[in-house]
């Protein structure tokens, strides 16, 4: 099975059926965004990720379906998610089971810092 797994993006070449089985396919991708719920999403931000995914898949149309190409799509999508975080469209889920600032420390305006420790870069 061809797949790409990054911290916030899982892509599989195939589909999940109604009875929760996975069927490999060469003509369909399944996307799982932020499976560990490390980020807080709005519907609008999630739709942007899905739209960017569709654009990336379209850009690769006609190329061989290889693990390398799927990983490139996943990597590009991970960078896109990071840009959403930096723009403030999504945020870290500080209530998650294991908060992890894998995309950099949160950007907090200085006037909002009250008794918080912000590491010096």
Swiss-Prot record:
NDH-1 can be composed of about 15 different subunits; different subcomplexes with different compositions have been identified which probably have different functions. One of its GO terms (cellular component) is plasma membrane-derived thylakoid membrane. It comes from Synechococcus sp. (strain JA-2-3B'a(2-13)). This is NAD(P)H-quinone oxidoreductase subunit M. NDH-1 shuttles electrons from an unknown electron donor, via FMN and iron-sulfur (Fe-S) centers, to quinones in the respiratory and/or the photosynthetic chain. The immediate electron acceptor for the enzyme in this species is believed to be plastoquinone. Couples the redox reaction to proton translocation, and thus conserves the redox energy in a proton gradient. Cyanobacterial NDH-1 also plays a role in inorganic carbon-concentration. Belongs to the complex I NdhM subunit family. GO terms for molecular function: oxidoreductase activity, acting on NAD(P)H, quinone or similar compound as acceptor; quinone binding. The gene is ndhM. Its main location: membrane. The keyword NADP applies. It is a peripheral membrane protein. PANTHER family: NAD(P)H-QUINONE OXIDOREDUCTASE SUBUNIT M, CHLOROPLASTIC.
């Amino acid at each position: 099975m061809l797949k790409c797994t990054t911290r916030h993006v899982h892509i599989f070449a195939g589909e999940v059926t109604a009875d929760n089985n996975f069927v490999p396919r060469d003509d369909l991708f399944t996307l799982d965004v932020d499976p560990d719920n490390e980020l807080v999403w709005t519907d609008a931000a999630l739709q942007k990720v899905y739209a960017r995914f569709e654009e990336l898949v379209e850009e690769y149309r006609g190329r061989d379906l290889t693990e390398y190409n799927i990983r490139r799509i996943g990597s590009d999508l991970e960078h896109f998610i990071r840009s959403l975080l930096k723009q403030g469209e999504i945020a870290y889920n500080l209530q998650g089971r294991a908060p992890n600032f894998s995309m950099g420390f949160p950007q907090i305006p200085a006037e909002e810092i009250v008794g918080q420790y912000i590491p010096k870069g």
